[in-house]
Swiss-Prot record:
Gene Ontology MF terms in the entry: rRNA binding; structural constituent of ribosome; tRNA binding
Keywords for the protein's UniProt record, in alphabetical order: Ribonucleoprotein, Ribosomal protein, RNA-binding, rRNA-binding, tRNA-binding
Assembly: Part of the 50S ribosomal subunit.
Organism for this UniProt entry: Lacticaseibacillus paracasei (strain ATCC 334 / BCRC 17002 / CCUG 31169 / CIP 107868 / KCTC 3260 / NRRL B-441) (Lactobacillus paracasei)
Family classification: Belongs to the universal ribosomal protein uL16 family.
GO BP term, pick one: translation
SUPFAM superfamilies registered for this protein in UniProt: Ribosomal protein L16p/L10e (SSF54686)
Transmembrane segments: none
This protein's name: Large ribosomal subunit protein uL16
Known function: Binds 23S rRNA and is also seen to make contacts with the A and possibly P site tRNAs.
GO cellular component: cytosolic large ribosomal subunit
Alphabetized HAMAP family for the sequence: Ribosomal_uL16
Amino acid sequence: MLVPKRVKHRREFRGKMRGAAKGGRNVDFGEYGLEALESHWITNRQIEAARVAMTRYMKRGGKVWIRIFPHKSYTSKGVGVRMGNGKGAPTGWVAVVKREKIMFEVGGVSEAVAKEALRLASNKLPIRTKIVSREEVGGQSNEG
């Protein structure tokens, strides 16, 4: 699973998720991508479940790019712990995904296989998503 190697601060503020993503809105690596239609925290377990679903469907063909990384830690207090006494212990890691962010990209397979793999991945995520192609949202061309 994806976790940071080291962090400066173990406990972070929750932050705000207003507006659309500033970067990562183009399909830059593969031919097809999975775009978020709403903002949400995506846990490292959800990212891994989506990755496994895609790679199992595509078998040995193609390549998957994960464009999000869980940099933010989230905390929780134990069950039955009274209020106060500081912030809880870090529980897991999340990626802050804003709307219009491309989360996953797929390349090297046919359109039907790519769309089905991304559909299976979207079922593992807690947000509404859209499958987009490089032509729809733009992206860097691979020609030199």
